[in-house]
Amino acid sequence: MASQGTKRSYEQMETGGERQNATEIRASVGRMVGGIGRFYVQMCTELKLNDHEGRLIQNSITIERMVLSAFDERRNKYLEEHPSAGKDPKKTGGPIYRRKDGKWMRELILHDKEEIMRIWRQANNGEDATAGLTHMMIWHSNLNDTTYQRTRALVRAGMDPRMCSLMQGSTLPRRSGAAGAAVKGVGTMVMELIRMIKRGINDRNFWRGENGRRTRIAYERMCNILKGKFQTAAQRAMMDQVREGRNPGNAEIEDLIFLARSALILRGSVAHKSCLPACVYGLAVASGYDFEKEGYSLVGIDPFKLLQNSQIFSLIRPKENPAHKSQLVWMACHSAAFEDLRVLNFIRGTKVIPRGQLATRGVQIASNENMETIDSSTLELRSRYWAIRTRSGGNTSQQRASAGQISVQPTFSVQRNLPFERATIMAAFTGNTERRTSDMRTEIIRMMENARSEDVSFQGRGVFELSDEKATNPIVPSFDMSNEGSYFFGDNAEEFDS
C-alpha cells in the first residue's frame, strides 16, 4: 500500500483535513491530541482530582465517556423523546475514584452535558473537534478488542468464532466517521452488513420508502468501505456483486461470510493507530508540552515516547496480576490485539502472553464491586523498541497457527512470516455446495491455496531503537516460528456484552 495516490492518509481522516503535507499533518494531529489533553486537565480541576487521581486510568475512562456521551446527538435526542426513569437526558456521569485515608473510594458523579461540551470546546479553540472525540472512541474500541472476545456476536452472524482476528473495531459506534471506518476489520464490516441484511429479510419495509432509500445508501457505503479493504481484484469484484444485489438476502450473506473467511489468508488492509487514554495527553500538557508546535503522529515513534515517560495507575482487584493488567493496556494503546505475540514480545522487550493466561479482568470496575479490597498499581507501558504501525494486511504465507485464533492481523510493519492454519481455513470452503458458484470464488480459493510460507511480509521492515527517531536503522528480528503466536489462542476471555 505504498502508492497512496489520491488516498488521504489516516492522519488526514483523523483530523478531517484535506490533503496536507507531512508537517501540516503532524501539526493537526498534534492539535487534536493537545485538545484532548487540555480538556482532561480542565476536567481534573473541575472535579477536584489531585495528581495521583488524575493519573488513574479508570478516572480517565469515565471522563472520556462523559464527553462522548455529551456529544452523542442521536442518543441525546432519543433520551429526550423517550424519558426513562432515573435518566436525566441533560446530565452525564460515571464513577470517579478518590484516595481517602489510604483507601480508594468510588463516587458517582453527574455533570451537565452542556457544561462538559463547553469545557471541551474551550479546550479545542471553540470548535467541536470531532476528530478528538473519534480518537477517544478508537482508544475505547482498542481496549475492548484487547479485553474481550466476540465469539457470541460472530456466532449470531453465522461466522466462525475463530475468525476473531478480523474483528478489530467491532464495538466502535457507527458515528465514528472515516477514521473509525479505517480501523474496522473485515469481519466487523461483514458483521454490520449481515445484521443489516437480516433486518431487511425480517422487515418488509426496511428497504422501502424514503427511509429505505437512506438505508440503501448506507448499505452501499458500507459495501464500498469493505471493498476498499480488500487487496485482490476477485474479492473486490465479489463486493460489487454484494453491493449491487437488487434485494439483499441469503445469497449476499453467503458471499460476505465467504469473503470474511478468505480474508484470513488474503488479508484486508486495516489501519492501526496508537490511541492513548486522555490522562496521558493531559499529563504532557500539564507539564508544558506543546503538541501542536512539536507535531505528533499516531503511527510513528511519538506514542512510544509519550508512554516512556508517563506514569499512570490502574485499580487492581485482589486476584489480578498488575503485570498482566499492564500488558492488556499496553496492547490496547498500540491497537495490537490481533498482532502476532512474537512481534509484540520483541517490541515490548518483555514476554507477552495469550489472553487466556492473563490474570486480569477488564480495566473498568463495575458499580457493585466492593472497593474495600481494591488497590492500585503503576501500569508498565514502556517498550524496548518502536515500530511503524501498518495499514496493510501484509502478504500471506503458510505458517502454523492455533486452535483458538487461526490468523493474525498485523499492527506493526515488521518483516515476518504471517501465521495461519491453511488446513483449518480451507476446510471451511469445502462441503456446502448450494451457494452461488462463480469465477470469483474459484479465483479466490485458488489464490488462497497458492499462498506460500516463503512469502515474507513487510520485506526489510524492522523495529527501531527508541533513540532512532527518524527510523534510519531497522533491526529485523528473527522469530521462532515453532512457538504459538496468537493472543486469543484456545481462549476463555470474557465476552463483550453490548
UniProtKB/Swiss-Prot annotation:
Residues 1-21 are annotated as: Disordered. GO terms for molecular function: RNA binding; structural molecule activity. One of its GO terms (biological process) is symbiont entry into host cell. Its main location: virion. A motif (Unconventional nuclear localization signal) lies at residues 1-18. Coiled coil: none annotated. The keyword RNA-binding applies. It is found in: Virion; Host nucleus. It comes from the Viruses. InterPro entries: Flu_NP (IPR002141). GO terms for cellular component: helical viral capsid; host cell; host cell nucleus; ribonucleoprotein complex; viral nucleocapsid. A motif (Bipartite nuclear localization signal) lies at residues 198-216. Keywords: Capsid protein, Helical capsid protein, Host nucleus, Host-virus interaction, Ribonucleoprotein, RNA-binding, Viral nucleoprotein, Viral penetration into host nucleus, Virion, Virus entry into host cell. Belongs to the influenza viruses nucleoprotein family. HAMAP family: INFV_NCAP (MF_04070). Encapsidates the negative strand viral RNA, protecting it from nucleases. The encapsidated genomic RNA is termed the ribonucleoprotein (RNP) and serves as template for transcription and replication. The RNP needs to be localized in the host nucleus to start an infectious cycle, but is too large to diffuse through the nuclear pore complex. NP comprises at least 2 nuclear localization signals that are responsible for the active RNP import into the nucleus through cellular importin alpha/beta pathway. This is Nucleoprotein. It comes from Influenza A virus (strain A/Equine/Kentucky/2/1986 H3N8). The gene is NP.
